[in-house]
């Protein structure tokens, strides 16, 4: 006798279990945080300020756009939490509330806006030129949002 596996079988129900969904979500947030850490190590030092240009802003944009607002923001929050407790996750493998920590706070804003921008862009029903203009405007807003907490810090 041959038994067919159906979508109600143990394997099928495991694939759609809430526990597995939580593991997947946690894995995506961890991958986003790891991306922020590694890409944020790429820096361009400036002679007139202790704050270098880093690829962290780009990473926050990318993580927010790819993972969505919620997961992107959680990835940035996890990065901030790790840095706040002293883990060496910031540029130059530094940790703590250093001079650039305000920009890390801004990464949460960037991820939220970039995730929303990606959603709006994908659902925009106008012409391609209109979609590109909307996407560029929202990504520029996201990029600029890092400077508010960064400069205040």
Where do the PLM segments sit?
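Central hydrophobic cores of alpha-helical transmembrane segments
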Residues: 74-83, 138-139
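Hydrophobic alpha-helical transmembrane segments
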Residues: 5, 43-55, 80-85, 119-133
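Short helix-perturbing small/polar motifs within transmembrane alpha-helices
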Residues: 2-17, 24, 38, 93-148
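Interfacial aromatic-anchored transmembrane helix boundaries in multi-pass membrane proteins
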Residues: 41-52, 80-111
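A general structural signal for well-ordered alpha-helical segments in protein cores
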Residues: 31, 58-60, 102, 110, ...
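Hydrophobic transmembrane alpha-helices
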Residues: 2-73
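Alpha-helical membrane-inserting segments
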Residues: 35, 39, 43, 63, ...
């Amino acid at each position: 006798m041959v038994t067919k596996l159906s979508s109600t079988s143990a394997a099928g129900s495991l694939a759609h279990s809430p526990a597995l969904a939580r593991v997947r979500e946690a894995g995506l947030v961890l991958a986003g945080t790891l991306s922020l850490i590694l890409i944020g190590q790429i820096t361009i030092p400036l002679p007139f300020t202790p704050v270098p240009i880093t690829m962290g802003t780009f990473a926050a944009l990318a993580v927010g756009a790819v993972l969505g607002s919620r997961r992107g923001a959680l990835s940035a929050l996890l990065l901030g939490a790790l840095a706040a407790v002293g883990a060496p996750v910031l540029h130059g493998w530094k940790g703590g509330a250093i001079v650039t920590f305000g920009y890390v706070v801004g990464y949460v804003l960037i991820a939220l806006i970039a995730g929303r921008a990606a959603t709006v862009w994908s659902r925009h029903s106008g012409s391609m030129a209109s979609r590109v203009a909307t996407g560029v405007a929202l990504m520029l807003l996201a990029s600029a949002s890092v400077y508010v907490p960064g400069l205040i810090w």
